[in-house]
Amino acid sequence: MRKYEIMYIIRPGVEEEAQKALVERFAGVLTNNGAEIINTKEWGKRRLAYEINDLREGFYMILNVNSNSEAINEFDRLAKINEDILRHIVVKEEEK
């Protein structure tokens, strides 16, 4: 298992209830595929560096996880499909 940092941006028009459900759904995708979530940070609504689909803001979420590649691949696949996630990135943390 390796350490990863995942950041994703949720569309700003999503209601708070739906946003929480989306966060729980993607956390579930990771844990159901064998990942262990170490830390979750909600940065909240922030201005984007550039417009994405005519939107200037988004809700930022950051996860630190211990995971295998299968869980990361499944998260990546579902994040690409979901229209409420504007962007996402998965970074493998270097071992010290």
From Swiss-Prot:
Family listed:
Belongs to the bacterial ribosomal protein bS6 family.
Task: Please give the Pfam families that the UniProt record associates with this protein.
Answer: Ribosomal_S6
A GO cellular component term found in this entry reads: ribonucleoprotein complex
Any Gene Ontology biological process:
translation
User: What InterPro entries does this protein map onto?
Assistant: Ribosomal_bS6 (IPR000529), Ribosomal_bS6_CS (IPR020815), Ribosomal_bS6_sf (IPR035980), Ribosomal_S6_plastid/chlpt (IPR020814), Transl_elong_EF1B/ribsomal_bS6 (IPR014717)
Gene (name only):
rpsF
GO MF term set:
small ribosomal subunit rRNA binding; structural constituent of ribosome
Reported function = Binds together with bS18 to 16S ribosomal RNA.
Q: What is the designated name of this protein?
A: Small ribosomal subunit protein bS6
What keyword terms does UniProt attach to this protein?
Ribonucleoprotein, Ribosomal protein, RNA-binding, rRNA-binding
